[in-house]
């Protein structure tokens, strides 16, 4: 290793079906298959480069390598993390491993948002487009997930993780209200 080597690397986060379903209600266009997120290499540990506080992925209680946007409690739901090592991408978790991880974190049973319930607006809601009937006729092709600021994507994924935690209140390992 040379001193010229960068201390920042990329991880590619695969967008799963659950994540895609969630994002499709909040954006116009097709969600991407992968999201690339930078992380900082500190010795042998990997710490996320996030707007919030990072965490060391090796300290994940489930034992799997999970990429968090912000603090560890805000784990991305339904995500498979890929490790980028010397320009090669290899899978670090299996599909079964991801499912068991989500289950252990209490994030596996979240429900899709109900469209039109109390007109709850998110960062991805179109302010100009208030009716569902005109969605198809307008065909706004210029607005896709890739065009959105990174912070909007992070907020949507945080909302997804939060929704999963709320649906599992009282069932988790932390001993919620009983």
Curated annotation (Swiss-Prot):
GO terms for cellular component: host cell cytoplasm. It is found in: Host cytoplasm. InterPro entries: Pns11/12. Pfam families: Pns11_12 (PF17464). Keywords: Host cytoplasm, RNA-binding. Residues 168-178 have a biased composition (Basic residues). One of its GO terms (molecular function) is RNA binding. Residues 108-178 are annotated as: Disordered. Belongs to the phytoreovirus RNA-binding protein family. Constituent of viral factories. Binds to ssRNA and dsRNA. This is RNA-binding protein. It comes from Wound tumor virus (strain NJ).
